């Protein structure tokens, strides 16, 4: 193995992956409230745990953070006797142009900048180890006002190609099928939901313009796991003006024996998860009602809960004959359009299951 990129599972300080004593470089992406049960309910506590990956003399990089988070990261860097630098905007190419990114979304520019600085540092330290000063702590100020920015550099052709070819299934991903476009993003925190919603809003709008000869409908498939705040995650989605919203637990099918280890959580309480879906639907209706009062648009309160991802997908795609009022409303929506845009988000498990179905089922 020439290089290993190790991502922590939860936090950093006490995560099981935090066993590498001498990494080449460390990086921390934008912090958000996640895994609150384990990391604490404040951004300061989360930042403390995340900074647990810092190692003495190993350079660390992060993106611009909230002031309280940056203060904790800086203090932890000083404790661990290492430098911490904030990456600037993504370096331009040699001709001054902005590099193309294979993973779409404005928020990915920040991630790309962190990635290229981590890669550049790895190459420098591996190729010129004797020239690199391992401990830069003495030259660093660690208060938020003085946290140094990493130096910009021109991107080589290999960097440009890497950024352009980068692909992450389930992140800002589009899959086109006959009559349908699936937009998938496993965002599951408030900030990431806001970012991917902006991506979907712009991307779906562009598709509508490019296919102006077709009438379209927008459908949301949503779920999240854990103790996250449903209202906080659903609020950013209200502006998308969905024609129909579907909720389902992170179950591939309603048959337990169909679960696979790659995309299943075997510790989940199925009954509780299904109950949460109904709670999420109720919260969505409240969110949408509040949005009506602050927006000139009038969102449509059409939603439904399904027992599994497969049922939700096939109900949308197959559009079987139904008898209930809700189904009639859905049939009225889908029968009057030529193309359906389906946004799947809220959980990496949910997106993973959708990808599996799209790959294996005749959709």
Language-model segments: what does each one mean?
Residues 316, 328-359:
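A glycine-rich beta-strand to alpha-helix segment
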Residues 90-133, 251-254, 304-332:
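C-terminal lobe/tail of nucleotide-utilizing enzymes
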Residues 30-34, 89-91, 223, 249-254:
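Short, acidic/turn-prone active-site loops that include or flank metal/cofactor-
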Residues 66-79, 85, 182, 190, ...:
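C-terminal helical cap/extension that packs against the catalytic core
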Residues 9-82, 225-226, 231-234:
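Conserved catalytic-core segment of NTP-binding enzymes
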Residues 2-6, 16-27, 31-35, 45, ...:
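Nucleotide phosphate-binding/pyrophosphate-handling subdomain across enzymes
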Residues 1-2, 203-215, 319-341:
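Glycine-rich phosphate-binding loop signature in dinucleotide/nucleotide-binding domains
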Residues 63-66, 186-187, 221-226, 249-250, ...:
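Structural motif
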């Amino acid at each position: 193995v020439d290089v290993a990129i190790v991502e922590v599972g939860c936090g950093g300080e006490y995560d099981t992956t935090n066993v590498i004593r001498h990494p080449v470089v460390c990086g921390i992406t934008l912090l958000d409230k996640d895994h609150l049960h384990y990391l604490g309910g404040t951004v300061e506590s989360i930042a403390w745990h995340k900074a647990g990956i810092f190692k003495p003399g190993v350079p660390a990089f992060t993106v611009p953070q909230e002031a309280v988070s940056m203060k904790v990261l800086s203090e932890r860097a000083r404790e661990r006797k290492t430098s911490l630098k904030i990456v600037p905007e993504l370096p331009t190419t040699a001709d001054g142009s902005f590099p193309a990114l294979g993973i779409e979304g404005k928020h990915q520019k920040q991630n790309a900048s962190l990635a290229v600085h981590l890669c550049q540092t790895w190459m420098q330290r591996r190729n010129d180890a004797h020239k690199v000063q391992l401990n830069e702590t003495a030259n660093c100020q660690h208060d938020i006002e003085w946290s140094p920015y990493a130096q910009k550099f021109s991107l080589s052709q290999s960097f440009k190609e890497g950024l352009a070819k980068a692909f992450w299934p389930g992140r800002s991903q589009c899959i086109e099928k006959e009559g349908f476009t699936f937009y998938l993003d496993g965002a599951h925190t408030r900030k990431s939901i806001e970012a991917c919603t902006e991506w979907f809003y712009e991307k779906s709008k562009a598709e509508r313009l490019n296919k102006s000869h077709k009438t379209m409908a927008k459908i949301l498939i949503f779920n999240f796991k854990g103790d996250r705040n449903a209202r906080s995650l659903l609020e950013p989605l209200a502006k998308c003006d969905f024609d129909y919203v579907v909720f389902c637990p992170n179950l591939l099918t309603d048959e337990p024996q169909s679960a696979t280890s790659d995309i299943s959580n075997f510790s989940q309480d199925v009954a509780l998860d299904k109950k949460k879906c109904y709670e999420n639907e109720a919260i969505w209706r409240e969110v949408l009602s509040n949005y009506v009062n602050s927006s000139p648009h009038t969102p449509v309160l059409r939603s439904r809960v399904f027992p599994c991802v497969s049922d939700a997908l096939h109900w949308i795609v197959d559009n079987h004959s139904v008898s209930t009022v809700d189904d009639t409303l859905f049939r009225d929506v889908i029968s009057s359009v030529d193309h359906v845009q389906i946004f799947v988000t809220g959980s990496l498990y949910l997106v993973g299951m959708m990808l599996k179905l799209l790959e294996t089922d005749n959709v």
